[in-house]
């Protein structure tokens, strides 16, 4: 009996090895042809297993509003299904472009130098980015804090920072016109 070993292209093997570090079964599929539809891509992905979640992204504003962004995300039921999709689809031609299939990575919040926030990973689940962040303070506590701040500002106006001066139109204040405006005087100045 012979044992058949399946050889992977080097690129796909490195992509699959990255998957051992991944939690979940979420893939990023990029370099999508603008003519490929959400329906056709979903039907293609369903050949590899049960699709739990599929996010096909579109431009929300600007000149390309309503057009596909050129990438999507897909969650498979099992890791084996996701790995099989990577093996079969990465580098394959879909319409006029070669697909790029990778493990989806959690976005990392960029460090803002103005704030002392720590870098926090954003969840892979799209629902987490759409839900408002919950805080420990209730709405009424926030309102009371703002009212107290406004009251304090009204009682102690800051003398160091006076209000901005009224805009002047760079018109000499005391110079009054003694002659009427004439175009001939303007032409002679040129």
From Swiss-Prot:
Coiled coil: none annotated. GO terms for molecular function: RNA binding. InterPro entries: Nucleotide-bd_a/b_plait_sf, RBD_domain_sf, RBM18_RRM, RRM_dom. The keyword RNA-binding applies. Keywords: RNA-binding. Residues 25-106 form the RRM domain. This is Probable RNA-binding protein 18.
């Amino acid at each position: 009996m012979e044992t058949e070993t399946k050889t992977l292209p080097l690129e796909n093997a490195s992509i699959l090895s990255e998957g051992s570090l991944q939690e979940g079964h979420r893939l990023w599929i990029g370099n999508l042809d603008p003519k490929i539809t959400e329906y056709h891509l979903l039907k293609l992905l369903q050949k590899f297993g049960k699709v739990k979640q599929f996010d096909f992204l579109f431009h929300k504003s600007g000149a390309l509003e309503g057009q596909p962004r050129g990438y999507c995300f897909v969650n498979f039921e099992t890791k084996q299904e996701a790995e099989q999709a990577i093996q079969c689809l990465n580098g394959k031609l879909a319409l006029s472009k070669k697909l790029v299939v990778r493990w989806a990575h959690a976005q990392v919040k960029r460090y803002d130098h103005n704030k002392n926030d720590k870098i926090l990973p954003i969840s892979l689940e799209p629902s987490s980015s759409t839900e408002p962040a919950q805080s420990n303070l209730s709405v009424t506590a926030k309102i009371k804090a703002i009212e107290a701040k406004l009251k304090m500002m009204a009682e102690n106006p800051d003398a160091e920072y006076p209000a901005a001066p009224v805009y002047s139109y760079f018109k000499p204040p005391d110079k009054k016109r003694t002659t009427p405006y004439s175009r001939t005087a303007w032409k002679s100045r040129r």
